[in-house]
A protein has these predicted regions:
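Beta-strand-enriched, solvent-exposed domains that form extended recognition/catalytic surfaces
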Residues: 2-134
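Aromatic- and glycine-enriched pocket-lining scaffold segments that form the walls
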Residues: 5, 18-22, 28, 219-220, ...
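Short tyrosine-centred short linear motifs in exposed loops/low-complexity segments
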Residues: 64, 105-109, 213, 226, ...
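Extracellular beta-strand-rich solenoid/capping regions of secreted or surface-exposed proteins
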Residues: 99-103, 145-157, 165-181, 189-215, ...
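An acidic-aromatic substrate-binding cleft motif
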Residues: 126-150
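Short glycine/acidic-rich loop motifs that flank beta-strands on beta-rich extracellular proteins
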Residues: 147-150, 167-171, 189-194, 226-232, ...
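Right-handed parallel beta-helix
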Residues: 155-157, 162, 176-187, 213-224, ...
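Extracellular beta-rich repeat passengers
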Residues: 336-496
């Protein structure tokens, strides 16, 4: 069987595509995305709409292989057709002005013609059925709903039908045993951000949880967040599976932010963020709590601006330990795919980046920080080469003094201890980088960048091991890559 979201009002029907699935035309909706990677520190008001553009999407539910026919209405079918992730190996035919292909795996896909502008999201979801609506605390059936800020309590559940469009956001504090599931969409466009802090309750984003445990989030789509999209502050035992984060464009819209938490898994999810995609942070309020035991796997990640798989920049915690990013496709890495920014006091160790596939495209333009009202994005003719790995420990509080920090976070690790902002026992292995012909000609194998910097003389970096880096299928040696080190012992970084 297959089905699809059919919202009951005229919500952004696409003028760029017609889509047919197994011979049936289905509705194609639109969402807003960033037009180019141009971000800034919160200026007191939201990002201008003229820095954005529309993308299209279809939201499918299926348990069978699907034949998909896409008819482009604003671009030529004769252009360069890309179906991502490339690792899926989807073969494309062109028939009668249509792009024809099949998909059988659940997950998020992206169709691009020539570049990323005017792309099409294709979400193929596993069916999630609510057998008894009477047993669900908050049931959103077919239709459009306006709950505003949905405040959950312990043992609450939320179900979102595939035909439900919910204008609102989710909040919980000191709660446990919560389940949020379904194939519909939460849209946070009704929320206005009015202040700087991302850590506080003032602005919610799609989901914000404080001091919660035993949480399940399955299958739901989240769009148009006012700030960080999915927020977990000091949470324990959280399972996130097969969610879709998309249509994000506002300032600081990170995808998933996990703060001083433990026992977290994120699987089979699609995360397209404007800012960082997945990041693990530590902040003063919870600086006594380490970040431990986290697994991010089988995900499709797309970061417009910032970092993709990130530790930091805020690392106010005793330790980061046993954190794994594994078997993920990175459609766009922002400026860095695998990132450790130990900007505070934590000892970061036993972190693994494994079996990641990083796509570099010559139409990805450089990330720029907007510093004034008059500044425009003027780097549309340049190429951004995202770093495969970056490890550094520049001081967060020095870089962001405007936040008013006056001291280092409380921690068992004092300044001057070799563990303070230290990094050790890091594995980066089996990283498969794809680059297009333009990048290959201009940069060669030097498009693969490893950057390891220690800015604190009393701090130790050691046992950072990189093994199995491939470019377009060819394994690279250390001399093939652009390897940059500063302030680290010669044996701190080993490339195998």
């Amino acid at each position: 069987m297959f089905d699809f979201s059919n919202f009951t009002h005229r919500w952004g029907k696409s003028e760029d595509y017609k889509v047919f699935v197994n011979g049936q035309e289905i509705p194609v909706y639109t969402c807003r995305v960033s037009a180019y990677p141009f971000n800034r520190l919160w200026p007191g008001y939201q990002r201008s709409i003229d820095q954005t553009e529309c993308a299209s999407y279809v939201n499918l539910v299926s348990d069978e292989e699907l034949e998909i026919r896409v008819e482009p209405l604003s671009k030529s079918v004769d252009g360069n057709i890309m179906i991502k992730p490339y690792s899926k190996g989807i073969k494309v035919k062109k028939e009668g002005g249509q792009i024809v292909f099949s998909i059988k795996d659940h997950g998020g896909y992206v169709l691009e013609i020539d570049d990323y502008h005017g792309f099409l999201y294709i979400f193929n979801n596993h069916p999630m059925v609510c057998e008894d609506p009477q047993k669900v605390t908050h049931y959103f059936g077919k239709g459009v709903h306006f709950p505003g800020k949905l405040i959950l309590k312990s043992n609450d559940s939320v179900y979102v039908d595939k035909d439900a469009l919910v204008y609102g956001c989710i909040f919980a504090e000191n709660a446990e045993n919560i389940r949020i599931y379904g194939n519909g969409v939460f849209d946070d466009s009704g929320e206005a951000r009015f202040c700087e802090p991302c850590y506080e309750k003032y602005t919610n984003g799609n989901i914000k949880l404080y001091d919660c445990k035993n949480i399940q989030i399955d299958g739901v789509g989240f769009t148009n967040s006012a700030v960080w999209c999915v927020n977990l502050f000091h949470c324990f035992g959280v399972e996130i599976n097969a969610i879709n984060i998309f249509g994000q464009w506002r300032y600081n819209t990170d995808g998933i932010d996990i703060v001083n938490s433990c026992n977290i898994t994120v699987r089979h999810s699609f995360v397209h963020s404007f800012d960082d995609a997945i990041t693990v942070k530590g902040i003063d309020r919870y600086s006594y709590e380490s970040n431990r035991n986290m697994l991010f796997e089988h995900c499709v990640l797309w970061c417009d601006w910032g970092k993709t798989c990130e530790i930091g920049l805020e690392t106010a915690a005793p330790e980061y330990e046993n954190i794994i990013f594994r078997d993920c496709d990175i459609l766009r890495a922002g400026n860095t795919a695998c990132d450790i920014q130990n900007g505070d006091c934590a000892e970061v160790h036993d972190v693994i980046f494994e079996n990641l596939r990083v796509e570099l495209e010559s139409f990805y333009t450089p990330s720029v920080v907007q510093r004034s009202e008059s500044q425009i994005y003027d780097r549309k003719d340049e190429i951004e080469i995202a770093k495969v790995l970056s490890v550094r420990n520049k001081r967060y509080r020095e870089k962001h003094a405007f936040l008013g920090f006056t001291h280092e976070a409380e921690s068992k690790i004092p300044i001057g201890d070799k563990r303070f902002a230290g990094v050790h026992d890091i594995q980066v292995k089996d990283i498969y980088v794809y680059c297009d012909e333009t990048i290959a000609q201009q940069y060669g194998t030097k498009c693969v960048i490893l950057d390891v910097n220690n800015f604190i003389p009393t701090t130790e970096y050691r046992d950072i091991i990189v093994s199995g880096i491939f470019l377009n299928g060819k394994k690279l040696a250390a001399l093939d890559m652009d390897v940059r080190t500063e302030g680290v012992a010669p044996d701190a970084l080993a490339i195998q």
